[in-house]
Amino acid sequence: MGVKNWNNVIPWRWVGLEDISPGTIAIDLPNYLTRRLTVMKTTKSKDGRLPLAHVGAFLGLVRATLNSHILPVVIVDGPPESRKRPPNPELIQTANRLYQEFVKDGDPYNEDISEALWKSRAMRMYFATNHIKDLACVIGIPSITAPSEAEMIAAAMCRDNLVDTVVSNDVDAILFGSPHVTKQLQVSNNRILRVRLEELETHMQLDLERLRDLAVLCGCDFHEGAKGIGPRKGALLLQRHGGLLEVLKAIGATHSIREDFIRAREVFDEPSYLSTDGIDLRLNPPIVPKLTRSLRMVMSENAVQTTVEKILRLWKGFGTQQSSLEQWI
């Protein structure tokens, strides 16, 4: 969900790709997949084929970014925040089981798997997340499982200058302290739609601490918010009273209600305690045999050969590597 009614207050700007190129980007994979799956084909294929459009989308992203001297880093969710509605564990377990069956059988026309995936967009998302994580590994793209929310560790990585932006349309990435967030990545058009934290602070006349207060007042993933308070009214209240607790007192919130708001607000402070030490963001050599096998599950032999050759060329051209390609083949 992100934060309620913030779409029109974020000063997103179209800028040239040079804003992040050459560089490294952290991709909030759950957010990215959710957006992609909403525009992908949603009706069952007549030939019974599994919904695997995410593979082409991811390979296209990898080719476009590497070709523009941008290293994509895939970030996936860990355990959800305690105040966030937890995902359906049975759904996740089923998606994981279906994916393992798919990897074992290598059959993109498996009727049982296909039927289950076409019935549930959420199931497809979890399946696709597993698939893309494995593809990233064999391609050589860094893949990280977050301690909690993907956008939280991604924001910490951007804060610590490990990456140049966080690719997500969830404003939580900004509130978690990322100084640069990209909503749309249009590499082929040589542009991105992004916001800088300092621009949002200036636009709203609130610093990061007060922006976090505002998010909780408006309603976010961790609290339903205060009734009747949107971003502009909330900003005025914070400017007038100084902070979340003071605003809650001013509007007559009881002690127990104030405590609940404060506990939700504390979630946004968690990135301050996250360490990015030891995170390795190098582009590794493609593991050609495993990549070839993975691609054979989803495309023709000619397409596999062409795709592998393109990825190898991109890897060779991206930068100097310590390992020789031969030891990986």
Where do the language-model regions lie?
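Nuclease catalytic cores that cleave nucleic-acid phosphodiester bonds
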Residues: 122-261
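A short alpha-helix capping/helix-coil boundary motif
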Residues: 39-42, 109-113, 133-134, 190-192, ...
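Short charge-dense sequence patches
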Residues: 8-15, 46, 79-81, 101-107, ...
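Generic serine detector
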Residues: 21, 45, 68, 82, ...
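Noncatalytic, basic helical substrate-engagement surface that gates or grips nucleic-acid strands
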Residues: 2-10, 20-149, 153-157
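Non-catalytic nucleic-acid-binding/docking modules located in mid-to-C-terminal regions
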Residues: 8-10, 14-21, 197-329
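Acidic-enriched, low-complexity/disordered segments with a strong bias for Aspartate over Glutamate
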Residues: 19, 28, 47, 77, ...
